């Protein structure tokens, strides 16, 4: 893979111009659930796996700022940038940016939570969790995987595989996993003080 010099000021200036225009057009768009800060590293995933040449912390911070400044009304996720520069974790949290891992369990079950990052983010900021390609992980311990969901508290979760094949073989797991993602409010009791006639209507606010 060919990769740019991510620290090059000309490269960064043009990136910032692009992100600024994207923000003008798409910030706050109700059809966009979130935007990844994915302009750095191999495949936009923050790491430099294919070259081994890392960008600087100042460059990483500038990339975070250009998105946070131009998408103030859209959920943002940072991908692996803070894995390399832990000092930026608190900065991202302060700016309301969520954390996305691409991908969990890609190396080994022992790395399935990236616990330090998730622990810092999930209580105040959203988590976006993506799994290793499913065909490489058949034979997962489903209960252990669901336990990871409880630890990580994801608001979004992506399984990388053809949905038909996945649902044919693992529908029960997918349905159980879906119940661990996001938030569900289940009222135990409801008290209604308004009165109405039989078959009438009560307005709830």
Region spans (language model):
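Catalytic-core regions of glycoside hydrolase
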Residues: 34-165
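Ordered hydrophobic segments in well-structured contexts
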Residues: 2, 156-158, 201-205
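Extended substrate-binding grooves/exosites of carbohydrate-active enzymes
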Residues: 158-186
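A broad structural signal for short, well-ordered beta-strand segments within beta-sheet-rich domains
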Residues: 6-7, 32, 154, 187-189
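Surface beta-strand/loop "capping" patches
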Residues: 176-205
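An active-site-proximal structural segment forming one wall of the substrate-binding cleft
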Residues: 2-36, 59-66, 70
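Short, solvent-exposed linear motifs at loop/edge-of-secondary-structure regions
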Residues: 28-37, 41, 199-205
């Amino acid at each position: 893979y060919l990769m740019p010099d991510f620290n090059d000021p000309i490269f960064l200036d043009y990136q910032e111009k692009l992100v600024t225009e994207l923000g003008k057009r798409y910030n706050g768009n109700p059809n966009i659930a979130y935007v990844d800060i994915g302009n750095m590293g191999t495949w936009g995933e923050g790491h430099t796996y294919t070259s081994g040449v890392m960008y600087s912390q100042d460059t990483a911070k500038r990339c975070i700022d250009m998105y946070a400044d131009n998408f103030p009304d859209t959920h943002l996720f940072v991908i692996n940038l803070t894995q390399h520069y832990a000092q930026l974790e608190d900065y991202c949290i302060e700016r309301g940016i969520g954390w996305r891992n691409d991908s969990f369990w890609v190396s080994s079950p022992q790395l399935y939570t990236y616990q330090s990052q998730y622990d810092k983010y999930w209580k105040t900021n959203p988590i976006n969790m993506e799994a290793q390609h499913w065909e490489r992980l058949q034979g997962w311990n489903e209960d252990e995987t669901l336990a990871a969901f409880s630890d990580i508290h994801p608001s979004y979760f992506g399984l990388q595989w053809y949905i038909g094949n996945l649902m044919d073989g693992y529908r029960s797991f997918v349905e159980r996993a879906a119940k661990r993602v996001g938030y569900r409010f289940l009222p135990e009791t409801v008290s209604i003080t308004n009165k109405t006639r039989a078959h009438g209507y009560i307005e709830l606010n």
